[in-house]
């Protein structure tokens, strides 16, 4: 494996979300991937996020919202209903790579006190970050990750040299709209 440590990236996302103040409530947005909500490829990242919150802010309430990635109207309605019932919640996170799915809601319902953290530098996530709807993205430098993975693959195929470690973690980048132009 070549990439970021998913557990640590989740903990870093939680740190960024909570670094400014004492947090009482967090909206954790998850994707509906199957009817029983069992498919969860981002579980290690989410566990890192939740463990950090539990250790650092044990009084914090986590509100989990499920949205369907292919139903933007449903996602908007879910967020609208939640924030109508919980206007005090100012901290949002999504531990998969599709924070852009809530961008329409964030754009149409601005709140200067809201802090939103997402993961991965997909073009649509970067656009949301650039527009100020997302505060931080935790990501990795994909060209470096790709270079290391391809080099290891080539050395294995050509030279017969296996990687020294099973997991080869790369550094994590913290993106904000103020450093986005240089990324």
Predicted regions span which residues?
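Non-catalytic structural scaffold of enzyme domains
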Residues: 17-21, 36, 47-57, 103, ...
